């Protein structure tokens, strides 16, 4: 098989966008596939694709190709401000189709449809429209050359009518090698809540932080990207207290946080974006056997409720306070 990524395969795991490509590559290898890897700089990808063409001309067969999209448009996925008009990745998809190699891609996100370009990339209105046009160009190419798009959830397709080809849900998975969670707090005077994830206008957790500040029996650890916190700190500064810790960790550094928590929180203010987006941390909480507190009418909340792995609540301080108090008084709810 062929594994394609339009840039250097990320080695950091600060977010789902950096964690998933490497995990998928490892999964294919563990399944026994002989993987032809195409990634790296533009020149690296050109060289590897030329080598691939030579192998195919020599008679080598490939079952299929799988690609992971970047969170950036393909033409600027290397981080350059100006597009790479070499279009090497688009030409790769075209070549696969000509050769009869079915190509599927995991299409990561459509945050760009929800006014996040100015916040995430620091773009003004004109530049935002320009970058959106590059995202739309991606979809045109995918429709023309790919066999299937894998999406985080089926609901994402409803928000993306530009997708004309077959699409299937492929949400984040579980790493069964991770350590399972064991409750071992001798001091049960506090209920320890962990929030791991981004903070933005589409990921607002003010009711969670506000509730923790109100009650002495609650303790909250927020683990988020350093740049997200620098941007969003003003929103939450009035809620901060000595029972709310903010840290910036990733990868294996997260293990002690999971081990020391009683609950994993995905308690966001609901919005259209959250109704179809599956949080990577939802599945990482599950890996570590943490009960999950999520918001009703979000993808995470629906998943938690249907699988009975925690609590799915309206985004209301009163309901949240009542539930957390009940859990604190009877910790058997955590089992």
Regions found by a protein language model. Name each.
Residues 306-307, 311-318, 325-332:
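Conserved acidic donor-binding segment of nucleotide-sugar-dependent glycosyltransferases
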Residues 87-102, 113, 122-148:
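Membrane-proximal helix-turn-helix segments that form the acceptor-binding/catalytic region
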């Amino acid at each position: 098989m062929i594994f394609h990524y339009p840039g250097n395969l990320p080695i950091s795991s600060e977010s789902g966008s950096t964690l998933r490509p490497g995990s998928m590559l490892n999964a294919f290898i563990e399944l026994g596939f002989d993987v032809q890897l195409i990634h790296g700089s533009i020149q690296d990808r050109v060289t590897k694709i030329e080598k691939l063409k030579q192998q195919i001309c020599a008679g080598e067969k490939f079952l299929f190709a799988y690609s992971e999209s970047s969170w950036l448009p393909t033409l600027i996925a290397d981080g350059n401000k100006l597009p790479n008009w070499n279009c090497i990745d688009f030409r790769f998809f075209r070549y696969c189709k000509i050769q009869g190699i079915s190509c599927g891609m995991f299409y990561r996100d459509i945050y760009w449809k929800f006014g996040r370009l100015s916040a995430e990339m620091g773009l003004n209105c004109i530049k935002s429209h320009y970058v959106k046009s590059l995202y739309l160009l991606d979809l045109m190419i995918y429709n023309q050359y790919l066999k299937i798009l894998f999406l985080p959830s089926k609901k994402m397709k409803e928000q993306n009518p530009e997708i004309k080809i077959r699409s299937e849900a492929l949400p984040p998975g579980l790493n069964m090698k991770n350590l399972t969670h064991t409750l071992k707090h001798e001091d049960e005077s506090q209920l320890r809540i962990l929030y791991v994830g981004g903070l933005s206008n589409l990921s607002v957790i003010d009711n969670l932080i506000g509730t923790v500040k109100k009650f002495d029996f609650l303790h909250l650890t927020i683990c988020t990207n350093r740049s997200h916190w620098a941007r969003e700190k003003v929103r939450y500064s009035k809620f901060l207290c000595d029972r709310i810790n903010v840290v910036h960790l990733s990868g294996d550094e997260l293990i002690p946080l999971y081990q020391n928590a009683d609950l994993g929180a995905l308690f966001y203010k609901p919005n259209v974006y959250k109704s179809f987006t599956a949080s990577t941390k939802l599945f990482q909480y599950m890996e570590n056997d943490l009960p999950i507190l999520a918001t009703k009418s979000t993808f995470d909340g629906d998943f938690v409720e249907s699988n009975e792995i925690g609590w799915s609540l309206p985004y209301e301080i009163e309901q949240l306070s009542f539930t957390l108090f009940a859990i604190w008084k009877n910790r058997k709810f955590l089992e």
